[in-house]
Amino acid sequence: MNIKHLLATCLAATAFFTACKDSPNTTDPDPIDQKGSLYSVWATTEKGSYILTTSSLMKDTLLSPKDNKGIDITSHMPAAFYAIYAYNHHGKFYLSNDGKRFSQFEVINGSQWKETNALSFANPFFMGKVLDNISTAEELVLTKTAGTTNKEKNVLEQPIYYMNTRDMSINKTLNVEIPMIKYTPKQANGENDDPYIVPTSMTVRGDKLFVGHKYRSHITKLDIIDTAYVYVCDYPSLANGKIIKDPRGGFTAGHWEINKTTFLDDNNDLYVMTRRTNSSNYGLLRIKNGETSFDPNYFFDLKDYNVFKNSSSLIQKLGAGKAYISPYVLDPANKKVVADLRILIGGGESRTTMNFMENGKLYDVFKTDESKWYVFEYNPETNTVKRGAQIDPGVNTVYHVNKLR
């Protein structure tokens, strides 16, 4: 395994990272308490990808490969965008790498990167959806990005893997069969299209599985059919499956990578994000608790709000009836926008793919209007933000904010 030495990483990073003149004084790296809390920020530059660690996201410090404990992970993620095919689960990173090797990594001593396990699949494997509400510390429940179209059955066969996190063995696999449409859609020129299914969400609620999915064209490589489709079946038997659909908001938003576009509220109502083809007009549909069909009396039109403009971050349930759909805090049940975090931070944009919650507070990274990167803490109870650690201005993207321990 090719893991670069930390010293070489820091020397190489010096050439292309610059520090703001008003940045915190970080002549000496912050010591890492080996038994205390540890957090990480996954950042990329034009030349590579780095894990930056800190004992606190809210301290007045600069997170940088030059002055902090940056870990060069470029050799494991051959392109920066592959961070969307990586996930942090209970302090361990799971990486799809180049699709040939699915790896488990840990940050050791706050400054080293170690592969602790790996799993090879028979075919290319890129990490898809994570069913976080049924995953545990011992078992990660996940999918791969692309299922298999069975033309004889006219279904998409989508496996769900139950992986033992101790040794990365597969405890079991469930194969969901999602029925495809029974007609052939047309292209704009009137010719027949060639559609395929992309699962956009996987949610288990009680004894039901809900699989949001959309259609794309093999010919144009674009999203098609402005209808939200969700496959509902019994769980875990997968029996009694049916398709429910709703055209009010367009197709079920998202793609097959990890980003999460559905959420359960405090009442266990399931919300499904929708989007119009060829636009950035989003909305929310609802499947009420105990129901297996869309609520005909509910649609939250978000076309006037540029959700996900610069971010495809995970939707977070904040509690007290609120949810974070970057960059907005919403009260979905009452169809209200509670806050715009871009305004609360004083101007900026979130550009992450993975934020996280701790002790009832949201942590996300924003690039301010002054082109400075900061971690911000949002308190849903008080509707206020606090600015935390600064991230080196030499980065061009921050993908993940994670807690490692």
Question: What residues fall within each predicted segment?
Answer:
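Acidic, serine/threonine- and glycine-rich low-complexity intrinsically disordered segments
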Residues: 181-327
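Beta-propeller fold detector
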Residues: 62-77, 113-125, 169-188, 240-249, ...
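Post-signal peptide N-terminal segment of secreted/secretory-pathway proteins
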Residues: 51-162
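Bacterial Sec-dependent N-terminal signal peptides
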Residues: 1-40
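Repeated scaffold domains used in trafficking and secretory/extracellular systems
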Residues: 76-88, 122-137, 183-185, 195-201, ...
